């Protein structure tokens, strides 16, 4: 397959490198020092699942130079969604699809408004990975899985082709017929995890070990679950309990990407995570005081470090 990776950070860099290693035609879109390092030294992935080094990856800062592709793995930060979608729109004009592997539950609609609904599928990435230094992706733990699925029936063939490509490249992947539910299943945990680790400035190990923080994490997830159910998402009755067990299984040192962004003085995805829970809860008439408070505390930092 011909694949473009829009955003060669932790998620895009890891899975793009795996697909390239598997023999697929993969081009990365990156910028700044990461772009320069990839051009000079290649792309390196450090992972307990096996290190990867692509000595001469196809990389550019201009998607217009890539030409038509079958799939765009769309992994930019949420604040760049519309501008990045506009940049890759020409790449899928001849029948390709954009699959957002982002946080949040609104990317399909946001990208579809720019590129056309027929060109957007849904995707969920389960991985903890980040740019350790320019040109180097560091994967924490061993979780590295993709779930994706069509939104329209005409997208089924390309979804199946990508599934085969992933499995051939050694990527744990699953095709789902209910991508909306899959997105919400991740969102419920992630919105609470990212919000609370950022506000507390502590990794998941500290959060789950402290009784007060653990209770707050569970309460934030219960609020998000209630919002999802109010929107017709079929979450299991014991879903939050399952997610608490999932949280207990994660490496104690794991931090959310939003916590890392906060520490670095970068912009935050809070408006589309805990902020989105609070906003959608208000629209649905569902109480969400924990998420509203998490968002209120993080709001001053959403545009970057407070000077």
Placement of each model-derived feature along the sequence:
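NAD(P)+-binding Rossmann beta1-loop-alpha1 motif at the extreme N-terminus of oxidoreductases
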Residues: 1-54
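Short, well-ordered alpha-helices that flank and scaffold nucleotide-derived cofactor binding pockets
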Residues: 17, 21, 86-90, 113, ...
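Short phosphate-binding/catalytic loops that engage adenosine nucleotides
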Residues: 24, 43, 96, 171, ...
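Generic preference for hydrophobic
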Residues: 28, 58-60, 148
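Internal alpha-helical scaffold of NAD(P)-dependent oxidoreductase catalytic cores
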Residues: 37, 90-91, 113-119, 123, ...
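Rossmann-like NAD(P)(H) cofactor-binding subdomain of soluble oxidoreductases
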Residues: 52-136
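NAD(P)-dependent Rossmann-like dehydrogenase/reductase catalytic/cofactor-binding core
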Residues: 218-307
């Amino acid at each position: 397959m011909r694949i473009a990776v829009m955003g060669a950070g932790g998620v895009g860099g890891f899975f793009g490198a795996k697909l390239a290693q598997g023999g697929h035609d993969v081009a990365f879109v990156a910028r700044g020092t990461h772009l320069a390092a990839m051009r000079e030294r290649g792309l390196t992935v450090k992972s307990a699942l096996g290190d990867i080094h692509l000595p001469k990856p196809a990389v550019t800062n201009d998607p217009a130079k890539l030409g038509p592709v079958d799939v765009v793995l769309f992994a930019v930060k949420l604040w760049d969604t519309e501008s990045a979608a506009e940049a890759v729109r020409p790449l899928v004009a001849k029948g390709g699809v954009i699959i957002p592997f982002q946080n949040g539950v609104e990317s399909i609609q946001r990208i579809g408004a720019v590129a056309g609904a027929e060109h957007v599928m849904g995707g969920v990435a389960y991985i903890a990975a980040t740019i350790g230094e320019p040109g180097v992706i560091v994967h924490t733990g061993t979780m590295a899985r993709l779930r994706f699925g069509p939104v329209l029936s005409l997208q089924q063939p390309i979804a199946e082709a990508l599934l085969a490509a992933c499995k051939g490249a050694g990527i744990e992947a699953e095709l789902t017929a209910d991508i909306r539910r899959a997105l919400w299943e991740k969102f419920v945990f992630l919105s609470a995890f990212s919000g609370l680790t950022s506000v507390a400035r502590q990794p998941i190990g500290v959060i789950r070990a402290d009784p007060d923080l653990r209770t707050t994490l569970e309460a934030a997830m219960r609020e998000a679950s209630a919002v999802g159910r109010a929107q017709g998402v079929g979450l299991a009755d014991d879903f939050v309990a399952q997610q608490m067990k999932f949280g207990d299984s994660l490496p104690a040192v794991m931090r959310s990407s939003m916590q890392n962004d906060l520490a670095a003085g970068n912009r935050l995805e809070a408006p589309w995570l805990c902020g989105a829970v609070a906003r959608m809860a208000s629209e649905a008439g569902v109480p969400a005081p924990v998420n509203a408070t998490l968002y209120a505390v993080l709001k001053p930092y959403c545009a970057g470090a407070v000077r």
